[in-house]
Amino acid sequence: MPLLRRLITDHPHSELLVTTTTPTGSRLLIERLGNKIKHQYLPVDIPFFLNYFLNKWNPKILILLETEIWPNLINICKRRSIFTALVNARLSEKSKDNYLKYNSLIKPAIENIDLILAQFESDKRRFLEIADRKDINTCGNLKFDQDIPSELEDISKTIKQDWSTDGELRPILIAASTHETEEDEVLKAFKKILISSPNALLILVPRHLERFDRVKKIIQASGLALVSRSKKEDVKKNTQVLLGDTIGELNFLYSLSDVAFVGGSLIDHGGQNLLEPAAQGLALMSGPSLRNFSDISDQLIEKEGLAVIRSAEELSEKFIELVENPDVLKKSGEAAFEVFMTNRGALEKIINYLQEPLQA
């Protein structure tokens, strides 16, 4: 989003076409940017459909993000002399190994990309193991350049005060971007938390919207008192779980929380975005599967802004330790925020690299 907003500002007379591959992505894009952009679903990576798509839109430049390597799209753009850039590029060890299995397909695609801007040196190194290019640069991670609305802090303070019990603020754990089976572990941990902190509140936000109903049933089966964000149900004194079954509200829900557990990490998925809660100064917890964000997680662990947990028991113990020791909680959140702030600046670097092709 930071890159899109900057392109809109810097090139007000250019037409910006943004593609997505899912209805969720489409909905978020339209909600946040509306008529400032045009939206289309990206065609499948088959030449017939791609040529039709490119004939219709006739783009001057193609900007791909992170891991979006579409061999046919890239190769066709090369033949059409459409400048192609892969920005905020990342490549985990697992993805690199998978790409090497199809090197005859992936290597030419990477070689045909005009500009590659990797997030970190480790990403650059993995790209070089696939294709020997001397012109790959690193810019950091664009997600560090996200801005948190200034009014969010005041709004969240008011809501947390409304949720207080007997004048005491409730300790709030958010479990965000959870995947299948992780909710079971989180709920197990939260029941242990309630023994020592009976007024604690859990905000549970599944990663995929198609699982919202399933997760709601899991919470109901656990016997915990539940309200649903999508139904605009109020959090009352006896509420134990708020289900975040809406789209585009994760930053808002983070702002209401004290500690964040970020999912996709207790299972072998590689983790999810740690930067959104770090940007709000939350103490962080994650499972051990962090390969998708290894550079960021390594920094957070080193600064003691992220605790790696491996079970429901460890999750409950760490949360209790943090909320019962306000100084430790504050220090951990500040450490996470420091990592976030010191890594900002990728947006300006990327814009500088894109200036020439955008003005050509």
Language-model features, listed with the residues they occupy:
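C-terminal alpha-helical cap of glycosyltransferases
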Residues: 343-360
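Active-site and donor-binding regions of nucleotide-sugar-utilizing enzymes
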Residues: 1-153, 157-158, 178-180, 193-198, ...
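Structural motif
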Residues: 60-61, 172, 259
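Hydrophobic beta-strand scaffold residues
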Residues: 82-84, 226, 284
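Catalytic binding pocket for nucleotide-activated donors in carbohydrate/polymer assembly enzymes
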Residues: 113, 250, 255-339
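Conserved catalytic-core segment of nucleotide-activated headgroup transferases in glycan assembly
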Residues: 1-12, 154-231
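Nucleotide-activated donor-binding/catalytic signature segment of Leloir-type glycosyltransferases, i.e.
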Residues: 33-39, 216-244
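Short acidic alpha-helix that forms the nucleotide-activated donor recognition element
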Residues: 49-56, 233-240, 248-258, 279
